[in-house]
């Protein structure tokens, strides 16, 4: 499938899901929409996020719970694999994502958001070929600017330069 850069990527999942939180979650959904990849996932009841209700442009389903861990586990359960993008040590919901992947024995790849890691992510994607890819990581308030960095990283990841 051609993308914004006019290149053919090594592997693109059919669908990208996330929980809709600020930061990495929304960067994943924004990149998916820019690349014309189906997107979705689960979010807390009331479309809860740290900046208020998650905008309706994101095609997310609400869980019955307002608790973030419920949507985190549901997105892991409904996906083929999880890509955990981070900067520094895993903590909070990002660490929970890793632990829930371990608990459910679901494949995941945790990687720092650095351009030199794009090839490693592409290689993992080609190996796993996840039809539905869950993408998770820190919220914007715990890593200011991560939305922008993550979106650029994902746009580069799904292209061959």
Give, region by region, the residue ranges found by the protein language model.
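Acidic/glycine-enriched connector segments
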Residues: 4-132, 139, 146-158
């Amino acid at each position: 499938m051609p993308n914004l850069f006019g290149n053919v990527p090594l592997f693109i999942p059919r669908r990208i899901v996330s929980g809709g939180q600020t930061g990495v979650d929304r960067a994943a959904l924004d990149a998916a929409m820019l690349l014309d990849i189906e997107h979705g996932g689960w979010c807390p009841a009331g479309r809860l996020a740290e900046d208020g209700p998650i905008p309706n442009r994101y095609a997310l389903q609400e869980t019955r719970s307002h608790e973030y861990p419920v949507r985190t586990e549901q997105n892991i359960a409904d996906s083929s694999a999880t890509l955990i993008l981070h900067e520094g040590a895993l903590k909070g919901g990002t660490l929970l994502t890793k632990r829930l992947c371990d608990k459910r024995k679901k494949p995941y790849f945790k990687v720092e958001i650095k351009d030199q890691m794009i090839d490693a992510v592409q290689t993992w994607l080609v190996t796993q070929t996840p039809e539905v890819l869950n993408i998770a990581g820190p919220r914007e308030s715990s890593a200011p600017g991560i939305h922008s960095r993550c979106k650029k990283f994902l746009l580069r990841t799904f292209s061959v330069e």
